[in-house]
Amino acid sequence: MRALLLISTICLLARALAAEVKKPAAAAAPGTAEKLSPKAATLAERSAGLAFSLYQAMAKDQAVENILLSPVVVASSLGLVSLGGKAATASQAKAVLSAEQLRDDEVHAGLGELLRSLSNSTARNVTWKLGSRLYGPSSVSFAEDFVRSSKQHYNCEHSKINFRDKRSALQSINEWAAQTTDGKLPEVTKDVERTDGALLVNAMFFKPHWDERFHHKMVDNRGFMVTRSYTVGVTMMHRTGLYNYYDDEKEKLQMVEMPLAHKLSSLIIIMPHHVEPLERLEKLLTKEQLKVWMGKMQKKAVAISLPKGVVEVTHDLQKHLAGLGLTEAIDKNKADLSRMSGKKDLYLASVFHATAFEWDTDGNPFDQDIYGREELRSPKLFYADHPFIFLVRDTQSGSLLFIGRLVRPKGDKMRDEL
């Protein structure tokens, strides 16, 4: 059955190419980005290392299905803790980021520069709406110096919140997130367990704008196999083009790199050959291994099919960051966040990292000159109808805008597969 679907996809792609190749292609505007300073480049490398450590920690959590992390935003959250902390509370935040050898001013200036560069949606021609807000109990007043510095470096807002009326407090948090993302992320959380400390909330909406768009008329309903015995109905989008591609026969995986508009970043997908839990691939996934795989990629004709739609994920990163060494800030009896309020009256109760990530067809027009090439007649197939890992990578610094996995997209159960 799956083989028939693949054959039908190729036929549909061929017809779509014939229909669209006649359209003139507008040249994409070249991307321009200022070169990062040495301190920002160093922190870009450190944040990439953090990305894999945190992803691996979360992947081992049986309660976690889909994962969506923005490592640069997580790094900024650690910078914020370092900015507001003293003694071990501050030094642990830097250590988790592997930035203990950097001065405090280098960390904050470097992370601020990196965050501004990677989240510049105009230069990158992507949609990335990002907001960070630190909520404190109504009894706490944030220090003016901290408010000013955290806004300057991390564009972080601050607010008091009264959890005596928990329903109203949750509504306020979710309304702020919805407003920040233009309604794309309607809810961060349904509940907050610890209400006597500070809550750090990151709310994001990200939508890639492809360097060459998918066929907007070639969208159909297919099955996504969460497991061999559980399939959900999803909308799939398709296109054929020339991409960096690698098929690892030994490890039974394939990967493809898709440039985003302006080519300042790209989306990389790593997928097992067959339906299986991602645990095997995740054990292989490191910053060094990714570099090895990317070094083996070659430009190939690839017919790509991806799920279309919005994936919404909220993670409370508190326990996962604690597992990486951030133990003082989250401990009510040990936390020293006195630079935040002037007193040792705060601890980090939750770190909500909430993202809506939209997979859509939008992008630049096709380069029509490539479609007469012989190699496009027999493309490699990249049919993402089962769980996969993905990364959005900055082409200049190697920093990761996002790292995640799609295990269970939105969709109704279809039928059990044999």
Swiss-Prot record:
The record marks R377, S378 as: Reactive bond homolog. Keywords: Acetylation, Chaperone, Endoplasmic reticulum, Glycoprotein, Phosphoprotein, Signal. One of its GO terms (cellular component) is endoplasmic reticulum. The keyword Signal applies. One of its GO terms (molecular function) is collagen binding. Its main location: endoplasmic reticulum. It comes from the Eukaryota. It is found in: Endoplasmic reticulum lumen. A motif (Prevents secretion from ER) lies at residues 415-418. The modification Phosphoserine is found at S141. Glycans are attached at N120, N125. GO terms for biological process: chondrocyte development involved in endochondral bone morphogenesis; collagen biosynthetic process; collagen fibril organization; protein maturation. The modification N6-succinyllysine is found at K94, K296. The keyword Protein biosynthesis does not apply. InterPro entries: Serpin_CS (IPR023795), Serpin_dom (IPR023796), Serpin_fam (IPR000215), Serpin_H1_serpin_dom (IPR033830), Serpin_sf (IPR036186), Serpin_sf_1 (IPR042178), Serpin_sf_2 (IPR042185). Residues 1-18 form the signal peptide. CDD domains: serpinH1_CBP1. Belongs to the serpin family. Binds specifically to collagen. Could be involved as a chaperone in the biosynthetic pathway of collagen. This is Serpin H1. It comes from Bos taurus (Bovine).
